[in-house]
Amino acid sequence: MRLRGLCAAATLALFCVAPAAPSPQARAQDTPDPALENAQYWLGARGPDELELSLVRASEAHVGQSVSVTLRLDNTSESAVDNLQVTARRGDAVDTTTQARQQLAAGAYQYYGPSVSAGSLEPGESREVTLEVPTALGDESTLAITDPGAYPLLFTLTGTRDGEAASFAEERVLIDVLGDPAQHEPAADSDSEAEERHQFSLIYPVTAQLDVVPGDTGGQDLILESENLAGQFAPGGRLDQLVETYLSHDLHGSGCMAVDPALLDVADRMAAGYTVNPSRPSIAQRPKRLRDSWFSASEQDRGDPGTGSADAAAWLDKMRTVDCTMLLPWANANTDAVAEANNAWLTHEALERGADTVSRILGTTVNSELTAPASGTTAHEFSVPLVVADNSTWVGNATTFDSSLGALLAESGSMPQTVGYSNPELRYDFAEDSEQARALTAGASISVAAAQEDQKDMVAKLPNYLDPAAARSVMETTQRLLDAGQLDPRPVTALPIKSAQEGPDGEPGSPYPDPAAFREAEIAQVAQQARYTDELMSIMVNEPSIALTRYGFTLPLRRDLLIALSDTTRTSLRGNAQAARASRERLQKNSDALRDLRSSVSLIPPGNVYTRVSESSPLLIVAENGLPLPVDAHLAYDAPDGATLSTQDSVHIPAKGSITVSMTADLPSDMDRTSLRLWLATPTESDGPAGHLISEPIDITVQTRAGIVSVYGVGIVAALALALAALFRLGRRKKKKSHG
């Protein structure tokens, strides 16, 4: 039961037009993989529906008034269904967000309301029905709602298939039922009421999937795989709506936008111009001969100019007007996975680069030092304080948010997230309920949390991958409660930062299994590539005449690794498999790019056999560098016992150039030929370990003086033999002539 579009959500007064029904192919792509790893941690309650029942729109709900609800029916099966009927039911009002989650997962819904007939549907057919749901006690088929509050509603779709009765689908939603609009509700101004109000703060994340083509290096133009981001930056696009929604609501200073610095960086580069292409040309290509370039199609393979530069620039202008900013990890990377990769530069880019990026692009400083990871938990200590769930344990410094409210808010949007800090018994495929229903639920959950009596402070953290419909619903409800004095605004900058808190077993992190956690093999691959990137950087040398630095050149390669560790769609049941696949593909392409860059620094063998005129004759070999910066490398070798090479401590190869390296050799005199293997390695300290291999090893054979003498001796003997044979034949001919 899904709605394929995003509709405005203002409390429950949401009116939008349903988009066309999705194609069977689209449904197939969104369907969870039945063989999903750790399926028991994703699906704890509610099974899949046979058909789809999706909330399209609903009128604002008030006590004693009817609610008009429009739903769409989609027959996604391969057979016809008949005698369809949609019925409305409700459960008791919920007092806590935990109760709300329990009702949505496995509620009783014991109060029955009206039904409406929906006829028959052939395979692939869709239909909309409108249901008037009375709430007054005296009405017929009423849900009998007499008090304001948050109520769980259930819409069921039943009918027959091949003459057999069946239940085909359900749609569950939490709605905010307001009081009678004719009765004025004064704001809570008394001292006693003020003491009962929650201090409220809201964290509003903004991020997106970044499809920068892997293998990017410093100094290169931006290449994107698609125009997906351009569409989100355009007026009415997802990112444009998110910023507009934040700016158009007054949260009385209680809200703060948690922005992904990687998104800002890509938007800034898009504004300067970019290209759309599924691949990128190698920057380490060796020069080609003219005739080799005649039939090259490389110029035709460079892609098309991007069309979203102006929209990206306009979006950044809006971002510069945001009143409060804080940070997400770079590319919304999983902070625990970054820590387990155990690379200092990678951790720096994930958590410490963001503030400088905001300052450089937006011209402002971040208002809060807090960073909000998508996981909502941390098992590692970082240099910056994190925002974590209040039911988790952590090391380092952190502030906490309401975990139950956070789990309920995370269920909203086109990519509903299964967060690791949520109770597995209350998990299910949240996308079984439509986006519109979950947007309404998100808004109502703020009202529920605001009315809870068991807590005084309230921090609402929206999901890191936020959609406009849910954002509008939450912001409308929040502003209504703040305007009415039912919440006390507290700036995010005023949130208390707490020191390490360990759990009963001493293990920090999530209290429950996280189904989206990165596997050890994935982290090991990232760690390996991060190390290779460090090694590549270590051989390059900054050149005063070249603006590009070695760190700047390798920086995009590290950022590729952070994109591969992104939680943006990985934490969603229906996005996990595709996210894991995209991560593997990015790591493979990044590995290919690293291999290409490393192989551009190479040794060129002098031929199969290198002949020395004398023992003091030097060996000459050419070292080539295809990188845009000079390279300092160590010439390493492997030789048989008794053979040694005297090489330079460091070989300096100019940028995009080559150099001839001279070395002397002390080779065994009793051997005709000596085989040597040479390669370039990372620089080493005098007493340090051997450097890591950079170039592919080459094999050369050195012919010694003894070998030369041996060859000459064989040649002389052969020449004498030929001369004697010729003299012998000549003598025989003379004898024959004399006898003739």
Can you describe what each PLM-predicted range is?
Residues L43-G44, S59-V63, D189-S192, S675, ...:
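Acidic, serine/threonine- and proline-rich intrinsically disordered appendage/tail regions
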Residues L137-L153, S669-R677:
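Short glycine/proline/serine/threonine-rich loop/turn segments at secondary-structure transition edges
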Residues A93-G119, A639-D649, A655-G657, M671:
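Short beta-strand and strand-turn-strand segments in soluble, beta-rich domains
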Residues P48-V86, V133, T611-L620:
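Contiguous beta-strand segments within globular domains
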Residues M1-A28, V717-G731:
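Secretory targeting and sorting signals
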Residues T245-L251, R353-T365, G376-S602, P683-E685:
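Catalytic grooves of carbohydrate-active enzymes
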Residues E171-V173, V177-K318:
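Active-site beta->alpha N-cap acidic-glycine motif
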Residues P544-I708:
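Membrane-proximal extracellular "stem/stalk" segments
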